Amino acid sequence: MPTPHEAEKQHTGPEEADRPPSMSSHDAAPSGPPSRNPCCLCWCCCCSCSWNQERQRAWQVSRESKLQPLPSCEVCTPPSPKEVQSWAQSFDKLMHSPTGRSVFRAFLRTEYSEENMLFWLACEELKAEANQHVVDEKARLIYEDYVSILSPKEVSLDSRVREGINRKMQEPSPHTFDDAQLQIYTLMHRDSYPRFLTSPTYRSLLLQGAPQSSEA
């Protein structure tokens, strides 16, 4: 059994030779937390932003590869006076003219009903598609964008047409939305078309094509 003197020696800590050398004032550790390199912070921030932008861009490309967004203007050539006048003859002539559709679409945008034209054009694209895989994907996107009640671009369809679409979506085809397309076409014809003919948009086009009177 160790004597009291030996026990005291055992609890006095390591011998002087075993103790680590004391640090000088130059080697002392800083009292506060280590400072970060501002360049590292800048790089991390830029890297994070860059990654988020790239992820968003990849998602957008993936979506656009399935259903290409329609251009804001189908054509850029100005219509002839005769063509502009023909738009007042019938709604069919307006809708069969790429320029007429573009002008009418711009008018619908001012009435916050552009989704009607967008839906009609999307249905036209679907009917021209032959690849069944693409048909399935486009039909799903058209449904989500224009038929779903959760979509901000939902078009106005009656319950009968909606029920028919829900049944057809089990096996989509290029003609899944034919009834809905006709209903929206009729809505634009009866509701928006008469206002378009009296709008400043259409009247200005008529005036541009009117013959100028010459002064003597």
From Swiss-Prot:
Its keywords, alphabetically, are:
Lipoprotein, Membrane, Palmitate, Phosphoprotein, Signal transduction inhibitor
Annotated compartments: Membrane
Query: Record's superkingdom?
Result: Eukaryota
Annotated ranges, domain RGS: 90-206
Its GO CC terms?
Answer: membrane
| Residue positions where Phosphoserine is found in the record | S24, S97, S151
The question of whether Cytoplasm is a record keyword is answered with no
The way this protein sits in the membrane is described as: Lipid-anchor
How does it get modified after it is made?
A: Fatty acylated. Heavily palmitoylated in the cysteine string motif. Phosphorylated, mainly on serine residues.
Concerning SMART domains, the annotation shows: RGS
Positions of the UniProt region annotated as Interaction with GIPC: 207-216
The Gene Ontology biological process annotation of the record reads:
negative regulation of signal transduction
Compositionally biased intervals (Basic and acidic residues): 1-19
Q: Where is this region: Disordered?
A: 1-30
What this chain does, per the record? Inhibits signal transduction by increasing the GTPase activity of G protein alpha subunits thereby driving them into their inactive GDP-bound form. Binds to G-alpha subfamily 1 members, with the order G(i)a3 > G(i)a1 > G(o)a >> G(z)a/G(i)a2. Activity on G(z)-alpha is inhibited by phosphorylation and palmitoylation of the G-protein.
What does the annotation say about its assembly with partners? Interacts with GIPC PDZ domain. Interacts with GNAO1.
Please identify the protein, giving its name as recorded.
Regulator of G-protein signaling 19
- Annotated organism of origin: Mus musculus (Mouse)
Give the taxonomic lineage as stored in the record. Answer: Eukaryota, Metazoa, Chordata, Craniata, Vertebrata
UniProt lists the gene as Rgs19
